[in-house]
From Swiss-Prot:
Presence of keyword Isomerase: no
Cofactor requirements of the protein: pyridoxal 5'-phosphate
Any GO BP annotation: L-phenylalanine biosynthetic process from chorismate via phenylpyruvate
Assigned keywords, A-Z: Aminotransferase, Cytoplasm, Pyridoxal phosphate, Transferase
Coiled coil: none
This protein's name: Aspartate aminotransferase
Catalytic activity: L-aspartate + 2-oxoglutarate = oxaloacetate + L-glutamate
Modified residues (N6-(pyridoxal phosphate)lysine): K246
Transmembrane region(s): none
Subunit structure: Homodimer.
Length: 396
């Protein structure tokens, strides 16, 4: 039965990590997978996380199963981070949150819930977007359509083309937005543009689905939620898939959340019971450790202050690397202007490198980037910057 199965193609991002591990060149540089690295090239465990783990180690009393939707305190903290403390939406009990295995788990639960319980058939995703979006929605039986996003010539958001392509989206379609730090371009709508999209979305009858994986990495925790909150102020219904992989550095703990918002408490409770049913048929209930860390930090003022400072430090380091990257490319004689990279948000930069140039970087210089030209700025350090920029200039 199994002998006729053909091999699946390598994942465009995780497959790159396998190639990187197998490369024995000493100066190799990994700008592929989206993990934060410090000045020494390590992905550290945050001090706030270590302290929370110490607390849990000493105070945890059981390893019993969690409920289907996870830790209640985690859900409460998640909603406050997304919608703001004292938000009317929270006070009116219009939101319910399920703890999920990472942001990917949240997206899949949202997709399964929609496919089974609503007339939704189509999900609109930006072009370009995170490659796994299409796989997740297709796996749940939903059709994926693309809307225009990026102006490659000017390295900006093509807002007119975005609106024009979304004019084809019908009432009852899901439109996926990146909450901030758009992956892979690093280009986000302005607050005014978010406002326009929120109004358009209500007018057209779309269901907004926010993929929110980088809160705190663009401008700050509150600022990065402005787009989502503009939608939440106008929409009766929306879904948020959020992740704590990046902003808490909890990549391998798989900590995510799927938050459902409806018109009133009774409706959201009824709908959420079906979301829990989708979870039960998938992984039954989530693991406790990562979400316990998040809930411990967010509900303790001292730990939260440490975490917020660490998040600020990570964000500022990435911004410094953007500036250094642009300056070093110029110093090394790059024959094109890369200053647009400074304006992008989050870990990634859409470099404008072609697939062939990316391949040459890997084969000739041991520099690993995604075929789309997306590079992880958080993988750059003062030590690897010169050889990296020399390699890029050589393939331009």
């Amino acid at each position: 039965m199994f002998e006729n199965i053909t091999a699946a193609p390598a994942d465009p991002i995780l497959g790159l990590a396998d190639l990187f591990r197998a490369d024995d060149r000493p100066g190799k540089i990994n700008l592929g997978i989206g993990v934060y690295k410090d000045e020494t090239g390590k992905t550290p465990v945050l001090t706030s996380v270590k302290k929370a783990e110490q607390y849990l180690l000493e105070n945890e009393t059981t390893k019993n199963y969690l409920g289907i939707d996870g830790i209640p305190e985690f859900a409460r903290c998640t909603q406050e981070l997304l919608f703001g403390k004292g938000s009317a939406l929270i006070n009116d009990k219009r939101a319910r949150t399920a703890q999920t295995p990472g942001g990917t788990g949240a997206l899949r639960i949202a997709a399964d819930f929609l496919a089974k319980n609503t007339p939704v058939k189509r999900v609109w995703v930006s072009n370009p977007s995170w490659p796994n979006h299409k796989s997740v929605f297709n796996a749940a039986g939903l059709e994926v359509r693309e809307y225009a996003y990026y102006d490659a010539e000017n390295h900006t958001l093509d807002f007119e083309a975005l609106q024009a392509s979304l004019s084809e989206a019908q009432a009852g379609d899901v439109v996926l937005f990146h909450g901030c730090c758009h992956n892979p371009t690093g280009i986000d709508p302005t607050l005014e543009q978010w406002q326009v999209l929120a109004e358009l979305s209500v007018e057209k009858g779309w269901l907004p689905l926010f993929d929110f994986a980088y809160q705190g990495f663009a401008r700050g925790l509150e600022e990065d939620a402005e787009g989502l909150r503009a939608f939440a102020a106008l929409h009766k219904e929306l879904i948020v898939a959020s992740s704590y992989s990046k902003n808490f550095g909890l990549y391998n703990e798989r900590v995510g959340a799927c938050t459902l918002v409806a018109a009133d408490a009774e409706t959201v409770d009824r709908a959420f019971s079906q979301m829990k049913s989708a979870i039960r048929a998938n992984y039954s209930n989530p693991p406790a450790h990562g979400a316990s860390i998040v809930a411990t930090i967010l509900s303790n003022d001292a730990l939260r202050a440490i975490w917020e400072q660490e998040l600020t430090d990570m964000r500022q380091r990435i911004q410094r690397m953007r500036q250094l990257f642009v300056n070093t490319l110029q110093e090394k004689g790059a024959n094109r202007d890369f200053s647009f990279i400074i304006k992008q948000n989050g870990m990634f930069s859409f470099s404008g490198l072609t697939k062939d140039q990316v391949l040459r970087l890997r084969e000739e210089f041991g520099v690993y980037a995604v075929a789309s030209g997306r590079v992880n700025v958080a993988g750059m350090t003062p030590d690897n910057m010169a050889p990296l920029c020399e390699a890029i200039v050589a393939v331009l």
